[in-house]
Curated annotation (Swiss-Prot):
GO biological process, one term: peptidoglycan biosynthetic process
Location relative to the cell: Cell inner membrane
Protein name (database record): UDP-N-acetylglucosamine--N-acetylmuramyl-(pentapeptide) pyrophosphoryl-undecaprenol N-acetylglucosamine transferase
Pathway: Cell wall biogenesis; peptidoglycan biosynthesis
Membrane association type: Peripheral membrane protein
A GO MF label: UDP-N-acetyl-D-glucosamine:N-acetylmuramoyl-L-alanyl-D-glutamyl-meso-2,6-diaminopimelyl-D-alanyl-D-alanine-diphosphoundecaprenol 4-beta-N-acetylglucosaminlytransferase activity
Function statement: Cell wall formation. Catalyzes the transfer of a GlcNAc subunit on undecaprenyl-pyrophosphoryl-MurNAc-pentapeptide (lipid intermediate I) to form undecaprenyl-pyrophosphoryl-MurNAc-(pentapeptide)GlcNAc (lipid intermediate II).
Binding site for UDP-N-acetyl-alpha-D-glucosamine: T19, G20, G21, N131, R167, S195, I250, Q295
Keywords, comma-separated and alphabetical: Cell cycle, Cell division, Cell inner membrane, Cell membrane, Cell shape, Cell wall biogenesis/degradation, Glycosyltransferase, Membrane, Peptidoglycan synthesis, Transferase
Top enzyme category: transferase
Length: 364
């Protein structure tokens, strides 16, 4: 049931949108707050993902007309003040209506105008940055925020590292040593291309696994590829003569991580938080076009801890390196266990609860 705009308790207002990487952490924290009886209202950008996703969780959402300026050329940057000012005024109207006790930015198009409006109105502002390379919006808002929270160390000079929220069923998985104990049969390789798929993985994994079929190690493959690339991925495995379970989407990620001995995936902040919470080693292939190369920065944190290996898809020898890395890891259960335990050691599985506590402490 969607919450009413009129409530005895002043709500927490969440600013987040544009991508799942901003929205899902906000939803996780909203869930904790609502479980404690705290009303939540969302401010998003009109026509973006959040307008469809947030109401499905029973949370009221208000929208403002705003869009990004990065990557749209110099004219867009020069015209940014003209475009942003109306959005700030629109955000102020929403804030006056709801009178939130605190405003929390997880990033995205609406977060900039919403955060600036909050500070102009004297409302407490909290920023949570998911990536090691902060987005433009949170970089600006961090200068005026009351509290600056981060998912990884090194996002800001003055920060509180609280981690990125993950689903409770993933955080509740047994430790790697328990899961892997007595495991026999083929090595279980989980490939995650994301909801849109990752063509480089869809093309490379079948070829590399075909080459590795001459080894003594049997491999069982589960490959999540996105709906649009399903037929292409199935064809690539069939052409390579490699058996694989190809899926457009995996609904039970906790079960998938529990099943896996090793994961090959991108390096988005939420995915890495899940890898750590589950405790599973990984081969990370950052999306090279990610803004500010933030996926590579994210991946380097896990690599430094011994929890992952990093490969760059733009490297000319990418296929060779991928084959070498997989040949080593698939044949070395002790190294896989060490990586999994290192990942688990980085986990901050109570991130959503920690963020909610900070929000309540800063409420007015």
């Amino acid at each position: 049931m969607v919450q009413s705009a009129v409530t005895h308790f002043r709500p927490v207002m969440i600013l987040a949108g544009g991508t799942g990487g901003h929205i899902f952490p906000g939803l996780a924290v909203a869930g904790v707050l609502r479980a404690r009886g705290v009303p939540v209202v969302w401010l998003g950008a009109a026509g973006k993902m959040e307008t469809h996703l947030v109401p499905k969780h029973g949370i009221e959402i208000q929208t403002i007309a705003v869009s990004g300026v990065r990557g749209h050329g110099m004219l867009a940057l020069l015209g940014a003040p003209v475009r942003v000012l109306p959005a700030i005024f629109a955000a102020m109207r929403v804030l006056r209506r709801y009178r939130p006790r605190v405003v929390v930015s997880f990033g995205g198009f609406a977060a900039g105008p919403g955060g600036i409006a909050a500070r102009l109105m004297g409302l407490p502002l909290i920023v949570h940055e998911q990536n090691r390379a902060p987005g433009m919006t949170n970089r600006v808002l961090a200068r005026v925020a009351r509290r600056v929270l981060s998912g990884f160390p090194g996002s800001f000079v003055a920060e509180e590292v609280v981690g990125n929220p993950v689903r409770k069923d993933i955080a509740a998985l047994p430790a790697p040593g328990v899961r892997f104990a007595g495991r026999s049969g083929p090595v279980r390789l989980l490939v995650l291309g994301g909801s849109q798929g990752a063509r480089v993985m869809n093309n490379a994994l079948p070829v590399v696994l075909r080459v590795l079929s001459d080894s003594d190690v049997a491999v069982e493959v589960r490959h999540q590829c996105g709906e649009a690339l399903r037929a292409e991925t199935e064809g690539a495995y069939a052409y390579a003569g490699v058996a694989a379970r190809v899926e457009p989407f995996i609904s039970d990620m906790a079960a998938a991580y529990s099943w896996a001995d090793l994961v090959v995936c991108r390096a988005g902040a939420s995915t890495l938080a899940e890898l750590c919470a589950a405790g599973v080693g990984s081969v990370l292939i950052p999306f090279p076009a990610a803004v500010d190369d933030h996926q590579r920065r994210n991946a380097e944190y896990l690599v430094a801890a011994g929890a992952a290996l990093l490969l760059q898809q733009q490297d000319r020898a990418f296929y060779v390196y991928l084959e070498s890395v997989l040949r080593d890891l698939l044949s070395n259960p002790m190294r896989r266990l060490a990586m999994a335990e290192a990942a688990r050691g980085l986990a901050k599985s109570d991130a959503a609860e920690c963020i909610a506590e900070i929000i309540l402490k800063e409420s007015i």
